[in-house]
Amino acid sequence: MNLRLKRWITAGATLAMVATMGLSACSTNRALSSETGKNEVTMASRTPNWIFPISAKGYTQGENGQFIQSLYRPLFAYKSTSETPYKINLPKSLGQVPDVSEDGKTYTITLRDDAKWSDGTAVSTRDIEFWWNLVTNNKDQWASYKEGFFPDGASLAVLDEHTFSITTEEVFNPSWFIDNQINKVALLPQHAWDKTSADEAVSDLDRTPEGAQAVFAYLQGEAKDLSSYAKNPLWQTVNGPWKLSSFTPDQGLELVPNENYWGEDKPKIDKLIYKAFTGDDAEFNSVRSGAIDFGYIPAASYNQRSAVESKGYNVFLWPGNTITYLALNFAPQAPGSKFINQKYIRQAMQQLIDQPTLSEKIWSNTASPTCGPVPMPADKVGTTDGCVYKFDPDAAKKLLEDHGWKVVPDGSTTCENPGTGDNQCGEGIEAGDALSFKLVSQSGFVSTHQMFEEIISQFGKLGIKIDMNEVPDSVGASQACDDETPCTWDLSFFGSQTSWGFPIYASGERLFATDAPVNLGQYSNPEADKLIEESTRSTEPDALQAYNDFLAEDLPVLWMPNPYYQITAVKNTLDLGELDATGDTWPEDWAWKTDGAK
C-alpha cells in the first residue's frame, strides 16, 4: 500500500514510453464496448476507506485520493508535462494559477466562476473558508498537519465570491508552497455540510472554534461509517464528474456520472466499477480470464505478459515520482529500538539488502533501487549510482564485529562487549542481547513475500533474526508508538506498490521531520530537520540535494527496491485518454473505442 494520497511524477522519457502504448485519447463520443455491449468499465482497486476530503490519521491509503478526486474537484491538480506555472493541470482544477506578491508572502487565487455543486449551488470562496475553519480548529485530527507548517503561520482573506488570498508570515519557495502546501486546500460544500446532525439545518457553525469542532466531529464520524457511504446524503453533494451509486466495504464500489456536472470533461462511460480482490492471485486470475477492463499484472507474474496481451490487453509499466523503504521504529517503546538507534546497525542492515538482485530476480525488473529520500533522476533509475550503501555482507559483518558483537552465521548474533565506546554495542544494549527484529509486512503480494524471504535469509547468514507478520493493512498495524499505545513492531513495509509518492516538489517534511504526520518510526535528527526546512525555503536546487545526501547516509529508514506503481493491463479497446506520470487517473476521459478506431 502506498501511503501517498495520489501524487506521482516522473521524467518525460517515461511519458514517451506510455504514449507508445497507444493510450492517448482518440475519441470523445460515448461508445459501447464491443466485448460487453455495455458502456461501463471495471477496474481493479482496493476499496477506499475514506470519503471526507480532509484526510484522517489511519485512513491514508492511496486509493482514497483517486476516489475523492472523482467526486470532489481539487483546488489544484497537477500534470508533469504541463507548461502552466507550477505544473498545474488547469482543466482539472477549480483554481487558477496563483499570483504571488512581490514580497513572496501573499498568494492570491481566483476560482473558476462556472463550477457548481451537484444541487446547483455555485462553488465559491465560502467553501474555501469552510475548509479553513474546519482544519485550523481541528489540526490534531488532520493527517496532513505538522506543527509549524501550513496552515500555521498563514492567514486566509476572502476577497470576493471567487477570489481569496493566503498570506504567510515568512517567505517560502513558491514552488514548494503551491505544490506541497496549498495543494492540501479542498473546497467543501458549506451550504450542505455546515451542521452537526443529519436533521439539523445548515448554518454558519464553522465560524466559531466550538462550532467548527462540532461540525468536524460530525463529518468525520459519518466518514468512518463506510457502509453508509452510498446512501448518506452528505456524500451526494459533489462538484466532480462522478457520484457514488453503491459501496460495499472490502468488495468494491460503483460510480455513475454526475448529471449536473458543470465541466466540459463530462464522463463518456455510464458506470465505473471498482472491484476489490483479496490479493494478487485473485486479481490476476480475473485479468487472465478477461473479466476485468483495467487491472494489473503482479510483478511475480510479469513473465506472463505475452499471454495477457493475447487476451486483448495493452500492458505497460506505470512509474512515478516515488521511493520505497522499510520503516524503522526508533520509539523507545519498540522492542528493538535500542538496536535501531545505533547507526552502525542500520548501516549493516542496509548493506545486507541486495537491491539490484531483488529488483531483477524477485520483481522481474519492474522495480529499481531506492538510494535516498528524493526519487532517483530518470537517467539513474535502475542503477545504484548515488547510493551510499551497496550490498556488502562482509562490510556488514565487520561493522557488527567492530562494535562488540559475536557474529554467529545461521545462529544468533549476540552482544559480547556492552557499553557506549566506539568498539562497543551501544547505549541500552546489554551483554547477551540477541540481534532480532519484529517485521510487519503486507499480505497478498507475492513479490513482497518472496523479497522478504530472501532478506530474512540474508540477515540470518549473519545471525540476525527477523520475525515476520503479514497483515492486510501494515500501516494500520504499525502506527507511531506512545506510552498508551502497545508497540510491537520494529520494521514495517507498505511498499508493494511503492511506499510514498511525492507531489511535484519532492521534499520530506511529512516523512522524516521530527513529529511529521507520516513519520511512523519517530525518526528525529536536528540536522535533518534543518535541511528539510531549508529545502522548503530556498529556491536553490542544492538545498534539496543536501537534504537527500544527509538522509541517504543517516538511514531514517532502510532503502528498498522501488516498484513501478503498477504493471497496468488495460483492454486494448478501452481509450484511457492522456495518461500522465503523476499517476492521477481521470475516468471521465475514458471511452470505449468505436469500431475501426485505433
Show which residues each predicted segment covers.
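N-terminal lobe/hinge region of extracytoplasmic solute-binding protein
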Residues: 44-102, 133, 237
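Bacterial signal peptide processing site
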Residues: 27-29
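C-terminal motif of bacterial Sec signal peptides marking the signal peptidase cleavage site
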Residues: 22-25
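Extracellular/periplasmic solute-recognition and catalytic clefts
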Residues: 135-145, 155-158, 245-260, 273-337, ...
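Surface-exposed binding/hinge segments that line
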Residues: 147-219
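Aromatic- and charge-enriched surface segment that lines or borders ligand/interaction sites
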Residues: 96-142, 159, 165-167, 175, ...
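Append "and occasionally in soluble cytosolic enzymes with long acidic Gly/Pro-rich linkers
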Residues: 236, 256, 340-457, 598
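Extracytoplasmic/peripheral linker and loop segments enriched in polar/acidic and small residues
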Residues: 346-347, 359, 465-482, 505-572, ...
